[in-house]
């Protein structure tokens, strides 16, 4: 039993048109009332009408090809490349040694401890702000690519629509040619008797056949452009989707974690410095106040425990950093591959258009 999905004239927007699918469509179109009407309406005696036959879908297909070429040429990875370079420079400034305990901290704690931690805090506070700016720009770039993919999806659907229109005109033209070829022998037989009127009718029929053959050929070439344009659109969409996925995983998620981790690590380090300072003060006080040594010592231990280990390990921050760097490298590779695919697609479509023009001039 035939279902709607098995109808070759019903195309899913995610379905790519193979040559077998195109052949099935043409075969089915021969039974369509609309195609039969198109064939009946063709006036082989009207040369101007034949020249305009199927003009609208052919023009639309040409416009779509130009839009695809334009999108390939104007889609720039320069901005994203600049952002990745800037992010790389920011990441180079991350130094996990900043969070290591310096030797002799207790001896130096009252001399330069405060200045040291403030310097580190300011450094990573600035770094966090710069990362946030890059994060915002990368998010905008992701949104732009998402919007582009929606536009490409719309272009794909319209391309399929006009492809089907072209198929109708091509099939109707072929059906009309078959009809004209079938009656050609009878006209030739009448003209062979020397009847001038029959000869004129034969010439008109032959000229009509030739003009229609040329027009059907041109429309068939335009159909091929549409057939080749569809996978090119999908190619662009897949490239954008890969970049969007990489940005989501490596940047949109990891950058906020990395930024917050740095801020927390710096804050915890500053808190620990305060706790250590208090511990040192307590130790000196104990030397003068022997009677309260045990209680103050116990309190110092408790404060040290409270200062404790940071909630976020430096290894976690370093791992996040490595993830971002890896993401940048993979993104650059994807962008280079997409650039190559766009350029290759542009050349292929441009070559197809050039072939159409050459073929038309040779007729």
Curated annotation (Swiss-Prot):
InterPro entries named in the record: Toxic_anion-R_TelA
Family membership: Belongs to the TelA family.
Designated name of the protein: Uncharacterized protein YceH
Organism of this sequence: Bacillus subtilis (strain 168)
